[in-house]
Structure formats: structure tokens, C-alpha cells
């Protein structure tokens, strides 16, 4: 017969006792109604049909939501989904930079040639800036990875580089006037040439270097889904900025009253560019908040494993006289607080990760586990089956000793007071005179581990300690793997090191030796991607830096060194202006292609998109040298935008995919962890390396050929070479070895 529920016995010590037959049943007079609500319908059947209790095994109740204190959870790696406007404002800096860069590429070569710079030397103007970028770009990237400014890691670099670009632009477009104010004459522009070259170097280096922290800024504050959208929006803004820049440069401002009031063509361009760059920089800096990085010496709050209670179980009967007596009402409220959820359900929904339980009762665990990385959770799940029994419940000799893992939340400090007859105790709680111990603690304590992998889920045994020696007095409670997760998920120290490893900077200080080691030990996939990126920029920069000169000399048959009143000089100026409109077509085609690139990625593979971009550019530059028809040459500019959009998007998207592999990202434990800022800088260094080679080769090549046709031939040939390399050598997917190993674990089949 099932005895009726009665008041708590006076000998109860910490938690109330129950009769053995009511092991899964809460006493009506001692427990809150919320506890009984957890009992499943099968347990209710058990109570309604006591004679059939041998054949109906009660289901264990579901665990509560994960009671993890919110202040101990580091949500730095969790990013909310960004809106379109946030991503748009975040990419505004690309609009301003490309607007400025359009002015530079359109007017640097004509301005320097008109000031008397020899043909053999004007290509070397582009040589100094890429040298500085190639040497300093990795250092800037590594520095930004470790920057501890309260404004964030990337935004201080964006601000400084934007200011540098504005100063360089001021010297570039006003160098001739400043030189005339110093000591230049109408036939000697040595000061003007020097100031213009300095402006080109500063402007080019700052504008190109600002791309890297802007990309890293977006990747830091966005999740994986928003990163692809952000890269496409960045390419879109870059294309629009270049397009509007070439539109402004292609207008004859000298013929307008506004241009005459400001002092000429270059003055109007300078005013437009300075305002655009300043406004877009401010919009980017205030777009999305950036979390500051903790200094190396600052100790972060350790996120220990939350004290996860077992599914609400009947309290364990303690021996009479063991410990201090506790009033029944106090013990009841204490147990109710232990068994009730103390954290609100997480608003996060499981989207990623292999740990998503099919048990609907594990809602809190699912939400908490899905908010962290898959590798972290899966590594903890494997520990479920490799760890040994660590806590034991000591019982009288008449009862078999069974292993149990009990984890209760700590009672608040205000609970321990003399009025309630309970004092704070450190360490295990001693019960009885025979030395038996009941350890009631949390998973925060260090626990020894046993070796070996179990081939089946472990079983938690909850003994029935209240009665005799029959088979039902030591009935085992079988708990499935999903329910054990509620007790052993988030194993303290190991989980903390895994969680903080990806978000905190490496303990190794920044040095040139460490940077060189990172470059030397570059993974093969990244090395091939860098080579392919180099070939793309080598072909593109050759066309971009000399396109307006190509239009003026080849298409319009002009001469930049002819007298200013001659027809040849006027033809050359008309060709430069028309070249600006050609670059405008290229820029808007890049913006359009960037807008549809996300849809194309759903239909075509990244390998195919790479192949199409290189092939289209090679055909476009090659056919431009074979035709003198202005409309044909301008229409071919659309192919240039396809390659530009590809170079601004796909390499960084592949790099993000590479970082999903633990093998590629490395580990802080063995010193192989890579930094996103450094690897983005390594990709960007290929742009500088390509510009260095263009500066060294294309000047003599143009002199040897006799026109700018040689530049277009060179760009077409390199583009076809990149087309082959992207198809044969680039790695587009790194197999996740770790994930495959975890999936082969038989234990995960019980989730």
C-alpha cells in the first residue's frame, strides 16, 4: 500500500524525505505545485494503477532550463542578425575610398605627364606605395588583431587611414598649385611633381590599407550568414563609389559657373571627394558597435559550468541525527528553489551545431547549447562518455553503494543565517558518524577523469534508501544520454579554454619573428588563394592604372606632351575624359554584378564564378586592343566590373569558409592559432605585390611597344593564366576532419 503524504520527519537534515514507494512523487504538504507538474503521464498512470507498478516504469521528468547566471555568459562571439541598413552603413567607407581612388586613377597620370614627368618614370610613381603596403600591411593587420582601444579593434585604424587618404588627396589634386606658390615656374614643376608624388603615395597606401580593417570590422561584428551579405554590400558600395567618382571626374567643370567659381576642374573634384570621404567614414564608424578587446594582463571573468540540477527527483533520505536540523518549511523552499528553473528561456533558437536534441523537454539545454560553437558542445558531449564517476553517495551498509552525480545550484548568501539554523560550510557535507559523505556540489570543482570510451550511454543509479532489502528497494533509475547532458554539459575549465580561445588574442606578443612565422607556415589552401588573388589584381591593376592614358593615346590618337594649344593635346584630354566615362561603366557594372552575385552563388559554384570572371576580363581587355570603335571599347568595360566584384568578394568569402575548419584556424594551446586580420592582410598584400610588378614592368613595356596597347595585352594574358589557376589549384572546401570523427562516435546516436 502506498502510504499517504505526511509532514516532514523531524530528523530531516537538508532536504525532505519521502516514502520509498513514492520515490518519484512529491509530498503534497511539502512541495510546490510546480514540481509535481514535471511528472510525466506515465508516472501518473503509475499512481492510478498501483497493482501494475511492476510493468510500468516511470519516465524521468524533464530537466529545467539551464540555470546559467547571465553575468557569466560571454556573448561576444554571438552576433544578432544585422539589418540591411546596418550593413549598408558599415560598407559606406568603401564608397568613399573608391570615390577617391577613381579621382586618383583618372587624373594622376595625366597631371604628372602634363607637368613634364618622363614616360620611363611615371609608372614608378605607383611603386613606392605598394612597397610600403607590402611591408606594413601584415603588421597593421596583426596590430589590429591585438588592439585594445575602447573604440574597438578595427575602427581606430579605419579613422587614421581615412585621414591619411584625405591628406594625400589634398596634395595630389593641389600639388601643382602649391608648387607654383613655392618656387615653380611655367616650365619647371619640380616642387609640384614632388608634392603630387607624395600625395599619390599617401593616398594610395591609405586607401588600399583601409580595405582590410573595414572587411575585418564587418566580419567581427557579423555572424556567418551576414558575412556573405556584408561582403556583397561592400563590393556594391565600392562599385557605386567608383562609378559616381568617375561621373564627377568626367564632367567638364571648367565650362560651368560652379567650376569657375572654385578655380577649375581639379578644385571641384577635390571638394566633392573630401566631403564624400569624410561623410562615409563617419557613417561607417557609427554603423555597428564594436566590442573592445581585453588587454593581455586583464583577467576575464571565468565562465564556469553552471550548476545544473538533475531532473526534479525525490530528495535523498539522510540518517537521523546527521547534521543540524532544518525546519520543514525551510527545507521545502530550498528544494523547490533547487528544482525550479532559475533562468528565463533563451531567446536564441538552435540553428547551427550537431547538438540539437530531439527531446522536446531539453528546451533550455538546446537553446544554451545552440548559442555556442559546435566544436565546443560536441567536445563536451564526448566527455560525457569518457569521464568516470566522481561523486558518490554514501549509504548504510544495507544498501548497495551506487554512483550518482548530483549538481545543485548554490544557495544565496542570505540563506545562511543563524535564524534558520544553518551555517555556511565549505567542502563536503558530513552525514552520520560512520564517515559517510554526501557531496552536494556543482560541476565547478575539479574532477578526475577516467580513461576509456563507453560503447553505450551511462546509467545514473538513484538508490531507494528508505526501505528494506527487496529488489525494489535498490531500484535503478535509467537516465538517457540527453538527460545526462543537463548535468554534465559545459565542463568548466576545458569549456572555458575552448570558448575563449577564438575570441581572445593570443598570449604570444606581437613581433616581426612571429609574423614571419605565420606567413611562412601559411596553410596550402591560403597560399593557393593568395597566388590566385595576385594574378587577378596583376591583370586588373595593369588595365586600371593606364586605362585613361590608353583612351587618350590609342583610341583618340592624342599626345600628352604636345603644346597645350595643339589639337593633339586637346584630343588627349578628350580621351582622358572619355576614359573616365568608361571607368564609370566598369564601376556600375561591378555594383550590379555584386548585387546579383549572392543569387549566382546559389546557382553556380565558386569555382565557376571565378572562371567566368577571369575569362570575361581576359576577353574584354584583349578585344579592346583590336578595335578603335569608341562604343565597342566602352561596352567592353562591363567585363572589368565582373572581375573587380569577384576580387572584392569571393577570396574573403573563401577565407571565412576556411576558418570554419579547426585544422585551418589552429589552436592556442600549441601556438598555431591564426588571426583573421593577419590573413586578410596577406590577401591584400597580393594587391600591393601586383602593383609593384605593374610599376616595374609596364613602364618599360609601354616604351618598347610605343603605346598603351602593351598594357592591355599584358592584362589579357595574365587574366587567362588566372583563369586556369583558379580552376586547377584553388581549394574551395576544406574537409572538416574533426566533425567527421565526432559523427563516428556511437554515443551521439542517442541524442
Curated annotation (Swiss-Prot):
User: Single Gene Ontology BP term?
Assistant: D-glucose transmembrane transport
Where does it reside?
Answer: Membrane
Q: Which UniProt keywords apply?
A: Membrane, Phosphoprotein, Sugar transport, Symport, Transmembrane, Transmembrane helix, Transport
Catalytic activity reads:
D-galactose(in) + H(+)(in) = D-galactose(out) + H(+)(out); D-glucose(out) + H(+)(out) = D-glucose(in) + H(+)(in)
Q: Which InterPro entries match?
A: MFS, MFS_trans_sf
Record field: transmembrane: 93-113, 123-143, 155-175, 191-211, 233-253, 268-288, 536-556, 576-596, 606-626, 630-650, 688-708, 710-730
- Membrane topology label: Multi-pass membrane protein
Name the Pfam families on file.
MFS_1
The superkingdom of the source organism is Eukaryota
Q: Which GO terms describe its molecular function?
A: D-glucose:proton symporter activity; galactose:proton symporter activity
Q: Give the main location.
A: membrane
Tell me the Gene3D superfamilies matching this sequence: MFS general substrate transporter like domains
Keyword hit for Transmembrane helix:
yes
Which residues are annotated as modified residue Phosphothreonine in the UniProt record? 500
One cellular-component annotation, GO: membrane
Q: Which family does it belong to?
A: Belongs to the glycoside-pentoside-hexuronide (GPH) cation symporter transporter (TC 2.A.2) family.
Per the entry, what this protein does is: Proton-associated glucose transporter in the brain.
Q: What is this protein called?
A: Proton-associated sugar transporter A
Organism in which the protein naturally occurs = Mus musculus (Mouse)
Amino acid at each position: 500500500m502506498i502510504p499517504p503524504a505526511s509532514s516532514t520527519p523531524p530528523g530531516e537534515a537538508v532536504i525532505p524525505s519521502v516514502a520509498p514507494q513514492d520515490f518519484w512523487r512529491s509530498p503534497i504538504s511539502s512541495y510546490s505545485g510546480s514540481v509535481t507538474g514535471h511528472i510525466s503521464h506515465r508516472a501518473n498512470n503509475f499512481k492510478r494503477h498501483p497493482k501494475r507498478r511492476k510493468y510500468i516504469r516511470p519516465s524521468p521528468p524533464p530537466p529545467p532550463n539551464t540555470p546559467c547566471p547571465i553575468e557569466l555568459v560571454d556573448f561576444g562571439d554571438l552576433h544578432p542578425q544585422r539589418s540591411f541598413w546596418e550593413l549598408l552603413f558599415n560598407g559606406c567607407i568603401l564608397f568613399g575610398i573608391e570615390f577617391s581612388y577613381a579621382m586618383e586613377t583618372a587624373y594622376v597620370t595625366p597631371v604628372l605627364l602634363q607637368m613634364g614627368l618622363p614616360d620611363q618614370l611615371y609608372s614608378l610613381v605607383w611603386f613606392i606605395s605598394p612597397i610600403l603596403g607590402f611591408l606594413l600591411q601584415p603588421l597593421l593587420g596583426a596590430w589590429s588583431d591585438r588592439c585594445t582601444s575602447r573604440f574597438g579593434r578595427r575602427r581606430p585604424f579605419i579613422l587614421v587611414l581615412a585621414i591619411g587618404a584625405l591628406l594625400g588627396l589634398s596634395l595630389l589634386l593641389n600639388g601643382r598649385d602649391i608648387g607654383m606658390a613655392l618656387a615653380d615656374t611655367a616650365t619647371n614643376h619640380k616642387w609640384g611633381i614632388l608634392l603630387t608624388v607624395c600625395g599619390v603615395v599617401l593616398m594610395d597606401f591609405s586607401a588600399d590599407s583601409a580595405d582590410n580593417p573595414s572587411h575585418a570590422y564587418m566580419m567581427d561584428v557579423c555572424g556567418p550568414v551576414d558575412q556573405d551579405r556584408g561582403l556583397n554590400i561592400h563590393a556594391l558600395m565600392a562599385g557605386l563609389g567608383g562609378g559616381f567618382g568617375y561621373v564627377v571626374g568626367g564632367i567638364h567643370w571648367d565650362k560651368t559657373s560652379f567650376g569657375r567659381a572654385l578655380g577649375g576642374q581639379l578644385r571641384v573634384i577635390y571638394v566633392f571627394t573630401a566631403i564624400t570621404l569624410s561623410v562615409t567614414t563617419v557613417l561607417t564608424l557609427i554603423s555597428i558597435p564594436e566590442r573592445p578587446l581585453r588587454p593581455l594582463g586583464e583577467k576575464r571573468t571565468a565562465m564556469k559550468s553552471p550548476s545544473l540540477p538533475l531532473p526534479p527527483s525525490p530528495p535523498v533520505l539522510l540518517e537521523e541525527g546527521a547534521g543540524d536540523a532544518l525546519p520543514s518549511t525551510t527545507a521545502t523552499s530550498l528544494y523547490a528553489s533547487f528544482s525550479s528553473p532559475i533562468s528565463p528561456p533563451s531567446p536564441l533558437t538552435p540553428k547551427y551545431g550537431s547538438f540539437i536534441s530531439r527531446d522536446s523537454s531539453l528546451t533550455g539545454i538546446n537553446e544554451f547549447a545552440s548559442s555556442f560553437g559546435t566544436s565546443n558542445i560536441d567536445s563536451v558531449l564526448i566527455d560525457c562518455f569518457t569521464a568516470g564517476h566522481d561523486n558518490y553517495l554514501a549509504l548504510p551498509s544495507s544498501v548497495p553503494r551506487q554512483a550518482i552525480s548530483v549538481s545543485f545550484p548554490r544557495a544565496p548568501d542570505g540563506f545562511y543565517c543563524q535564524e534558520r539554523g544553518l551555517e555556511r560550510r565549505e567542502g563536503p557535507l558530513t552525514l552520520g558518524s560512520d564517515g559517510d559523505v554526501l557531496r552536494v556540489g556543482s560541476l565547478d570543482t575539479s574532477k578526475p577523469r577516467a580513461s576509456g570510451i563507453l560503447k553505450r550511454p551511462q546509467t545514473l543509479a538513484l538508490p531507494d534508501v528508505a526501505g528494506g532489502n527487496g529488489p525494489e528497494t535498490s531500484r535503478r533509475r535509467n537516465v538517457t544520454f540527453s538527460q545526462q547532458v543537463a548535468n554534465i554539459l559545459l565542463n568548466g575549465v576545458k569549456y572555458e579554454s575552448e570558448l575563449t580561445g577564438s575570441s581572445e588574442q593570443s598570449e604570444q606578443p606581437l613581433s616581426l619573428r612571429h609574423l614571419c612565422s605565420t606567413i611562412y607556415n601559411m596553410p596550402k589552401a591560403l597560399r593557393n588563394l593568395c597566388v590566385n588573388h595576385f594574378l587577378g589584381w596583376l591583370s586588373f591593376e595593369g588595365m586600371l592604372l593606364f586605362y585613361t592614358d590608353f583612351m587618350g593615346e590609342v583610341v583618340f590618337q592624342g599626345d600628352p606632351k604636345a603644346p597645350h594649344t595643339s589639337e593633339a593635346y586637346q584630343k588627349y584630354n578628350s580621351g582622358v575624359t572619355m576614359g573616365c566615362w568608361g571607368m564609370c561603366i566598369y564601376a556600375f557594372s561591378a555594383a550590379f554584378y555584386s548585387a546579383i552575385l549572392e543569387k549566382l552563388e546559389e546557382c553556380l559554384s565558386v569555382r565557376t564564378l571565378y572562371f567566368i570572371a577571369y575569362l570575361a576580363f581576359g576577353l574584354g581587355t584583349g578585344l579592346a586592343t583590336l578595335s578603335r570603335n569608341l562604343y565597342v571599347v566602352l561596352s567592353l568595360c562591363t567585363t572589368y566590373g565582373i572581375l573587380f566584384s569577384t576580387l572584392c568578394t569571393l577570396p574573403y568569402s573563401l577565407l571565412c569558409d576556411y576558418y570554419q575548419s579547426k585544422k585551418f584556424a589552429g589552436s592556442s594551446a600549441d601556438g598555431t592559432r591564426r588571426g583573421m586580420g593577419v590573413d586578410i592582410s596577406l590577401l591584400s598584400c597580393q594587391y600591393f605585390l601586383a602593383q609593384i610588378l605593374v610599376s616595374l614592368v609596364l613602364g618599360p613595356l609601354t616604351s618598347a611597344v610605343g603605346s598603351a596597347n602593351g598594357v592591355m595585352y599584358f592584362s589579357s594574358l595574365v587574366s587567362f593564366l588566372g583563369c586556369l589557376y583558379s580552376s586547377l589549384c584553388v581549394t574551395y572546401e576544406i574537409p572538416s576532419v574533426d566533425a567527421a570523427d565526432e559523427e563516428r562516435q556511437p554515443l551521439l546516436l542517442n541524442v
